[in-house]
């Protein structure tokens, strides 16, 4: 380890920044956020420095660097475009045993500035030791996506509760269990983010007063249509907090690779070598694991409330008194149509869109007359086996036999394939694709060649 990570308390402590340009301005902003008593020395200053000085936030010393400016300083930063001046500052600081950072010259510096993720009071610092600042920045961007913006409020509120929690729960194990429930309580986190004091108080009192049983919870998460980049940030956060993930065939391998490595995985879909797990058995798996105290994520392709049976699963949990929450996902109709260059609505072609399941319960029948109307787009989920019947019924009820149609196979993934034609060909086209595929019927399909942007294998 070439550098020891430390966090400095600089509030009201004297610090010197040498430089008055854009780079120095960025360093000044960080020092001011940390509460430093900042002096800035330069031959000339960018306008922002003058504005800060006018507000009394820092002191400006215009002119050549003089080592006496380091007197009584705790920390210094050299951020000029003159290597000789930067070296002069570094040597003067070293002689006084003052830590000094030299921008873009880590070998001359006694400390380096990391990339920072600020969720005050929670702080995350990332450094490559000065060898690759771009890599550190890219890692910071990835972590920024994982850490919710409201995390700082949660951490700050936890600090306020520490004494009361210690008084309420006498044993270390009880306090640990309380904090585990506290930090994964999504309702509390959202209430803190919204500054909803009444809700925060109500949830806190419930957490403090209810028995510390081993009851877990279930989070229903929509994984989106396939491309892992379309998984929502909240969905990603939830699957990385899960003790167990119950998933089906429509969840891509790329998304499953994002699951916490030590989490249990239970596959409940249907594919080669596996039998489809009945819905009632899935419901019982969720219930059983939550009753064991697990944080369960039920991960479904697309959006769990659009032909995903999410409501059925939650009813079982609700009846059993198991806490649950829902993270919506991008449904297949939205994701697959976008990646296939097919706008679902368009002023000239479609003023509405209908999402339709290819499976009706107990032999039910669609309202084919209204489905055959113009100026709309039809999207059939799970409709491959019914494609010939869909073709026949739509034509029978008056739809133009030359209505454009498209089938999107493995939409949004690198395996995406789009097969297009007209309504009279729908049954035959369905024989050329495999599940999972989406059927799209409407005039908007004619725009595909013009609007297609996604390159796939």
Swiss-Prot record:
Annotated region (Precorrin-2 dehydrogenase /sirohydrochlorin ferrochelatase), positions in chain: 1-204
Give positions of region: Uroporphyrinogen-III C-methyltransferase: 216-457
Keyword Transport among UniProt keywords: no
Give the Enzyme Commission number.
Answer: 2.1.1.107, 1.3.1.76, 4.99.1.4
Question: So which residues are the signal peptide here?
Answer: none
What does UniProt list as catalytic?
Answer: 248 (proton acceptor), 270 (proton donor)
Cite the GO molecular-function annotations of the record.
Answer: NAD binding; precorrin-2 dehydrogenase activity; sirohydrochlorin ferrochelatase activity; uroporphyrin-III C-methyltransferase activity
- GO biological-process terms attached to the record: cobalamin biosynthetic process; methylation; siroheme biosynthetic process
Q: Which Gene3D superfamilies match?
A: Cobalt-precorrin-4 Transmethylase, Domain 1, Methyltransferase, Cobalt-precorrin-4 Transmethylase, Domain 2, NAD(P)-binding Rossmann-like Domain, Sirohaem synthase, dimerisation domain, Siroheme synthase, domain 2
Per its record, the protein catalyses:
uroporphyrinogen III + 2 S-adenosyl-L-methionine = precorrin-2 + 2 S-adenosyl-L-homocysteine + H(+); precorrin-2 + NAD(+) = sirohydrochlorin + NADH + 2 H(+); siroheme + 2 H(+) = sirohydrochlorin + Fe(2+)
Recorded hits in HAMAP family, A to Z, give: Siroheme_synth
Protein name in UniProt = Siroheme synthase 2
Protein source organism: Cronobacter sakazakii (strain ATCC BAA-894)
What is the phylogenetic placement of the source species in the record?
A: Bacteria, Pseudomonadati, Pseudomonadota, Gammaproteobacteria, Enterobacterales
């Amino acid at each position: 380890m070439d550098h020891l990570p430390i966090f400095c308390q600089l509030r009201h402590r004297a610090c010197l920044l040498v430089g008055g340009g854009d780079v120095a301005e960025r360093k000044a902003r960080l020092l001011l956020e940390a509460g430093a008593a900042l002096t800035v020395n330069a031959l000339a200053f960018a306008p922002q420095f003058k504005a800060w000085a006018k507000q009394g936030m820092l002191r400006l010393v215009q002119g050549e660097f003089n080592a006496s400016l380091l007197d009584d300083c705790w920390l210094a930063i050299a951020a000029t475009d003159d290597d000789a001046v930067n070296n002069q500052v570094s040597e003067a600081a070293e002689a006084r045993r003052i830590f000094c950072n030299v921008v873009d010259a880590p070998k001359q510096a006694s400390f380096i500035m990391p990339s920072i993720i600020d969720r005050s009071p929670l702080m995350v610092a990332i450094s490559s030791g000065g060898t690759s600042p771009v890599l550190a920045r890219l890692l910071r961007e990835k972590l920024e996506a994982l850490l919710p913006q409201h995390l700082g409020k949660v951490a700050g509120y936890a600090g306020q509760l520490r004494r009361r929690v210690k008084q309420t729960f006498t044993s270390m194990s009880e306090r640990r269990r309380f904090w585990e429930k506290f930090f994964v309580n999504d309702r509390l986190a959202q209430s803190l983010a919204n500054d909803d004091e009444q809700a925060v108080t109500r949830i806190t009192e419930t957490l403090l007063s209810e028995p510390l049983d081993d009851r877990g919870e279930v989070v229903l998460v929509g994984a989106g249509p396939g491309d892992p980049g379309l998984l929502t940030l909240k969905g990603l956060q939830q699957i990385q907090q899960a003790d167990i993930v119950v998933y089906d065939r429509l969840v891509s391998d790329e998304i499953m690779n994002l699951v916490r490595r030590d989490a249990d995985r239970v596959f409940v879909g249907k594919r080669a070598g596996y039998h489809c797990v009945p819905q009632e058995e899935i419901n019982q798996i969720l219930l059983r694991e939550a009753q064991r105290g697990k944080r369960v994520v039920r991960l479904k392709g697309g959006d769990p409330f659009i032909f995903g049976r999410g409501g059925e699963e939650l009813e079982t949990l609700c009846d059993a008194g198991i806490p649950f929450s829902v993270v919506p996902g991008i449904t297949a109709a939205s994701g697959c149509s976008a990646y296939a260059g097919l706008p679902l609505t368009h002023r000239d072609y479609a003023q509405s869109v209908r999402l339709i399941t290819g499976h009706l319960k107990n032999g039910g029948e669609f309202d084919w007359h209204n489905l055959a109307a113009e100026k709309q787009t039809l999207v059939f989920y799970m409709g491959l086996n019914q494609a010939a019947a869909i073709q026949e019924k739509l034509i029978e009820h008056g739809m133009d036999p030359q209505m454009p149609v498209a089938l999107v196979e493995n939409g949004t993934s690198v395996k995406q394939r789009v097969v297009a034609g007209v309504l009279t060909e729908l049954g035959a086209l369905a024989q050329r694709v495999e599940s999972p595929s989406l059927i799209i019927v409407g005039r908007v399909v004619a725009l595909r060649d013009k609007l297609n942007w996604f390159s796939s294998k």
